[in-house]
């Protein structure tokens, strides 16, 4: 029996003032998530991936100038997400961390 790591659905929003730093943040997020708006990504991550994502982004931003916010979404709230228009990818399974 193969055990799979539980995953958490996370919405990541950022405000990065410098084009170069912002480009680095976008490249990191594009590897693990889906862009749903100019500065917002949805990600389905294990705990290890989530921690790594935060560390990778922290290494690319200037905390006094930039902001990145991570919103973990519980299963109950995830099922209530509304997209207008409904064209976004829905993840198959979401687990609470």
Task: Give the location of each predicted region.
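Basic nucleic-acid-binding interfaces
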Residues: 2-11, 17-97
